[in-house]
Amino acid sequence: MTTAATPRLRIGVMGGTFDPIHNGHLVAASEVQQHLQLDEVIFVPTGQPWQKQTVTDGEHRYLMTVIATAANPRFTVSRVDIDRAGTTYTIDTLRDIRRTHPDAELFFITGADAIQQILGWKDVAELWDLAHFVAVTRPGHDLTESGLPHADVRLLEVPALAISSTDCRARVGRGFPVWYLVPDGVVQYISKHHLYRSPL
């Protein structure tokens, strides 16, 4: 008697600086999870991103991400990039996730703007072997399938939320509130730890 093969886990990997994580990140991850029927979405805060000079301490960004994702049972947070020394590259993130989930089908979730720059990323040829790529777009974005850098990239339109981490940091620095832009627990964490120069 033969037994049916266990289906492969379908895991989304959402890397980002998350400085701070905001509701736009969460909505995008939730939409991708639902649309692609992912078993899990792993949020991976970057350690030292190669394209940014200054970021908030990794432990703060990791803890804010844990707080933000805690209510969704399909969301988890990984420390692989935070705990790895040196500059963070997507290829290293995916290699580490592949080592811990050798049989899973991985889907790397990123923005449409980033996907158009992917050919300049480190070890780009291996990226396609490690994961499928999902480019999240907003209504009105003009990226089309013909503009994608590789056949294994799928476009997924998500609701438009005009929120950016840069704007959230600037608002806090000017003493403006970020309620409803970032999750409540993250607002409180930012205030408690006096992040972004000014308490809320």
From Swiss-Prot:
EC category: transferase
Disulfide bonds: none
Reactions performed catalytically: nicotinate beta-D-ribonucleotide + ATP + H(+) = deamido-NAD(+) + diphosphate
Residue stretches in coiled coil: none
Keyword entries, A-Z: ATP-binding, NAD, Nucleotide-binding, Nucleotidyltransferase, Pyridine nucleotide biosynthesis, Transferase
EC number(s) per entry: 2.7.7.18
GO MF, any single term: ATP binding
InterPro entries named in the record: Cyt_trans-like (IPR004821), NadD/NMNAT (IPR005248), Rossmann-like_a/b/a_fold (IPR014729)
Cross-referenced Pfam families: CTP_transf_like
Superkingdom as given in the UniProt entry: Bacteria
GO biological process: NAD biosynthetic process
Pathway per the UniProt entry: Cofactor biosynthesis; NAD(+) biosynthesis; deamido-NAD(+) from nicotinate D-ribonucleotide: step 1/1
Membership in a protein family: Belongs to the NadD family.
Role this protein plays: Catalyzes the reversible adenylation of nicotinate mononucleotide (NaMN) to nicotinic acid adenine dinucleotide (NaAD).
Full protein name: Probable nicotinate-nucleotide adenylyltransferase
